[in-house]
Amino acid sequence: MIPVVERRSPEETRACILQVAWELIRQLGARATIADVAERLGMSSANVYRFYPSKQALSEAVASSQLGAIIAEGRRLAAGPGSASERFGAVLVMMYHCMRDQMVNQSRVHEVVEIAMSERWPAIEAFKLDCCAIVADLVAEGQRRGEFGPGDPQYLAAQTLSACACIHHPQLIAQHGDTPTTLPPEAVVEFALRALTHPGPFPPNTGA
């Protein structure tokens, strides 16, 4: 049990509730309740409800927090050293590992991910938009540097993420897993980079 110290600020208490709720979701999945969180924290359920009016609100806040951490890491990698191509690859591979290790391989968490995606929680929709924005910025930078071909960066980012869905979409990762036919994330990234470098129609196959 993690007792809540009386002197904690509301922000610190809110963060504690989120942390414990995430731990319980990893253990119990969708069965985790407000009462479970309150018991773990040594609080009353009524006190937890002061911060989150429902189990749904708390679950969505946890999703927003976890996905927000992935976005923060994506932005850090996107702003790091190296070419736009290298940073694009780093962002996509990071997303793959986060989704596989945190959202798919932990079965209880995956239960909640499935619910969140089927119900189109706002956190999921915000995550998609943020991912697209990160990739669009990298595409625009790559175009300025001559790494990528012409085209609207936002459109190219959306199409690229769709083409790479098998390495960042939790449901697709769960379906395919580590089967022999599954491409490693690096191979998918390489394919996407070739398309960004030559965004026009592919030349006909000459059989060479």
Show where each model-derived region lies.
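Amphipathic alpha-helical packing segments from all-alpha helical-bundle domains
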Residues: G68-I71, S118-R145, Q154-A158
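Short hydrophobic/aromatic patch on the recognition helix
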Residues: G42-Y52
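Helix-turn-helix/winged-helix DNA-binding modules
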Residues: G29-A30, R50, R145-F148
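Hydrophobic alpha-helical connector segments
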Residues: A61, R75-V104, L156-T160
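Amphipathic alpha-helical segments enriched in hydrophobic/aromatic and basic residues
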Residues: I25, T33-I34, S45, K55, ...
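Basic, helix-initiating cap at the start of DNA-binding domains
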Residues: M1-R40, A57-E60
